[in-house]
Amino acid sequence: GLPEVVVMDEHGVMNDNSGDFRGLDRYEARQRVVAALADAGYLEKTEAYTVPVGQCHRCHTPIEPYLSWQWFVKMAPLAAPAIEAARKGQVKFYPARYKKVYLNWLENIRDWCISRQLWWGHRIPVWYRDGETAVSVEAPAGDGWRQDEDVLDTWFSSWLWPFAILGWPEETDDLKRYHPNSLMVTGADIIFFWVARMVMAGLEFRGAVPFQHVYFTSILRDAQGRKMSKSLGNSPDPIEMMERYGADAVRFSLIYLTPTGQDLLFDEKRLETGR
């Protein structure tokens, strides 16, 4: 196939593969490339149009496609037993409609990129030395070994949670007593990130589903239906709400107004109902 050519570095600056545009910021480089095409007579036309651009969820910086080496887990063999477990009723979902959501994701699953280029996290347990590669939590014997600089996706440790917290891989008394469990209570927004992966991990590493029942709670959203978050600043202070309306009124309002199996769109005015 065609050679894989990377034209910018990790900071969005054009690299040595960019010729005359080397050292330019990506935004300036775009303008220079267009101008160069026009000067050479290769620019047929320009037109305005709208295109979706991915953004970092933290800083909202536009994301650039970037070729790099990453670690992946082949997921299809892991998904097959998890699909069968749901179809046979070994794992049941409440509300029941989430079974379809769970199955649809697993039946169309893609390989999982588990490596991240972050300064914090669980280090990937792979070591390199002079063309050698070793997989080990601890550094191999001898000098000169260098650990992989990437860390694992946070969900990679989370999918092991049902049995890792009980002492696994050791066969501890807690592991024998509490795994598998009966009930998992969580939010439906992480059914893919966590629930499905925990089922896959349990079947792969323990030979059993980690829980038989999954209950999805409602999610408290703002009046516009957005998930509450620090970055949006749309989450009310519960202490202030309780001081204003009373703790019992807040509790009753949330319980009474939340529709069964659906998310609640929160408006402070609705706390008057509870009071």
What spans do the regions from the language model cover?
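Alpha-helical recognition segments enriched in aromatics with Gly/Pro capping
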Residues: 1, 5-11, 117-262
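Residue patterns forming the tRNA-binding/recognition surfaces of aminoacyl-tRNA synthetases
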Residues: 1-131, 226, 232-233, 237-275
